């Protein structure tokens, strides 16, 4: 029989965790944030991890630095998290200088490369930080050094294995780059650190405002390359740059879909916009009217009864990918072979960005996996809809036959583990349907 999990995959950003490498790490590093932002039932799987190299700004990363970074990854692994990483030197903020230089940033990327590759299965993306206050590319001796920026982005792209992505802040930053390997440009996504749905007075030039050249550029790029996109709302502050007003939920939803967001911060503006999203209800008719894709099963419980969803829940559950095994899928045993004809849809905002393998597995009555059958498919191609039919959910058919090599009665399932060997059999890092 063909079985499918009812679990859901959630990919919001858990929190901005700012840590200097000389600080002590504790086992409850992320648990406290889960409790602080009322997310115990959200099954969050992603954290934005800042790592400050302040102490080493003009010298080699020593064993202390590298071992502490390793501790961060091991803590994340123990709790089943992946990370959006950002390295920086200046955590003091504006009107200060971290003293960073092209020479030492390139040296540090060189030193970090083996470690990044060792833990690549726990990395969602790496933001191109290093320069400026909080790694935001301002308030820096390198602010106007384009040669340094070219070299740093090129080095970081080389450090990560293809097809893993990096993120930059603005399309203008990306346009200005001269890369050492131009073919890597499609691996540069964006981190929208000022998501306001274009509704703040400072949105132009800071947010990606609908109908602007920047917005159109990102829309075209993400369709062509399916790179990583993430965002965060400004803090709820009655200041020039704060956001002390509610932004329009459906407009936000359309942006998340059009720019194929994979992650979103739930901590900034938590007490205003995020809490409001938890109260606003979303209905199938409203989504249909706005051409937002979804699977009908999302609005039903296990018994088939209709359920009401909040805007927060819908965003939480559709960031990145949301894979659905369709009811017409079949798996049959014939003459010692397993014949499969599977139909999968993806109603998430984006797709499976980083490498995953796809298997059929035969599961015995006692719950043990008796056989793994690897399928020759690339889930990154499972985009939610095609350019030809942008408002229709695309269907992906996986059809074939494989020698079962077993006799008896088994359940059949789809297994999509992390490709990296040390995480392959860690269920926390497998895709859930």
Identify the role of each PLM range.
Residues 253-328:
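Catalytic cores of secreted or luminal carbohydrate-active enzymes
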Residues 125-132, 136, 140-281:
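Catalytic-core regions of glycoside hydrolase
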Residues 1-45, 50:
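Boundary/entry segment of secreted carbohydrate-active catalytic domains
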Residues 30-90, 103, 160:
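Aromatic-lined substrate-binding rim segments of carbohydrate-active enzymes
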Residues 8, 44-48, 80-84, 123-127, ...:
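Structural preference for beta-strand elements that scaffold enzyme active sites
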Residues 64-82, 98-127, 147-159:
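An active-site-proximal structural segment forming one wall of the substrate-binding cleft
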Residues 56-59, 92-97, 134-138, 175-178:
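Extracytoplasmic/secreted cell-surface and envelope-processing proteins
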Residues 313-433:
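Extracellular/luminal regions of secreted and cell-surface proteins that mediate adhesion/ECM remodeling
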């Amino acid at each position: 029989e063909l079985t499918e999990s009812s679990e859901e995959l959630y990919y919001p950003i858990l929190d901005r965790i700012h840590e200097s490498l000389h600080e002590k790490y504790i086992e409850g590093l992320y648990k406290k944030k889960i409790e602080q932002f009322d997310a115990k039932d959200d099954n969050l799987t992603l954290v934005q991890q800042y790592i400050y190299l302040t102490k080493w700004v003009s010298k080699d990363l020593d064993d202390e630095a590298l071992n502490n970074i390793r501790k961060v990854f091991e803590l994340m692994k123990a709790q089943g998290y992946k990370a959006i990483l950002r390295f920086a030197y200046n955590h003091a903020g504006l009107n200060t200088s971290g003293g960073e230089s092209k020479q030492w940033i390139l040296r540090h990327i060189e030193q970090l490369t083996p470690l990044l590759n060792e833990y690549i299965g726990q990395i969602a993306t790496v933001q191109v930080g290093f320069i400026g206050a909080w790694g935001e590319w301002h308030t820096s001796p390198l602010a106007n050094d384009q040669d340094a920026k070219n070299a740093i982005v090129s080095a970081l792209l080389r450090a990560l294995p293809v097809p893993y992505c990096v993120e930059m802040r603005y399309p203008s930053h990306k346009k200005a780059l001269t890369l050492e390997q131009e073919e890597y440009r499609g691996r540069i996504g964006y981190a929208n650190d000022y998501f306001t749905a274009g509704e703040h007075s400072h949105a132009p030039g800071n947010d990606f405002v609908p109908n602007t050249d920047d917005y159109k550029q990102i829309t075209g790029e993400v369709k062509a390359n399916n790179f990583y996109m993430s965002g965060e709302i400004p803090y709820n502050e009655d200041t020039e740059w704060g956001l002390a007003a509610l932004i329009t939920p459906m407009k936000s939803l359309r942006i998340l879909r059009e720019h194929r967001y994979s992650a979103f911060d739930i901590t900034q503006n938590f007490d205003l916009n995020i809490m409001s999203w938890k109260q606003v209800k979303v209905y199938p008719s409203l989504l249909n009217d706005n051409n937002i894709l979804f699977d009908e099963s999302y609005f039903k419980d296990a018994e088939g009864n209709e359920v009401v969803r909040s805007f927060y829940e819908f965003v939480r559950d559709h960031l990145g990918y949301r894979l659905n095994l369709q009811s017409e899928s079949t798996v049959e045993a014939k003459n010692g072979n397993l014949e499969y004809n599977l139909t999968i849809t993806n109603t998430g905002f984006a797709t499976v960005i980083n490498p995953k393998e796809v298997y059929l597995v035969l599961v015995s009555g006692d719950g043990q996996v008796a056989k793994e059958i690897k399928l020759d498919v690339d889930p990154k191609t499972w985009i939610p809809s095609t350019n030809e039919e942008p408002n229709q959910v695309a269907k992906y058919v996986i059809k074939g036959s494989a020698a079962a090599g077993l006799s008896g009665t088994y359940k059949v399932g789809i297994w999509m583990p992390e490709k990296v060997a040390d995480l392959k059999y860690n269920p926390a890092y497998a895709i859930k349907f």
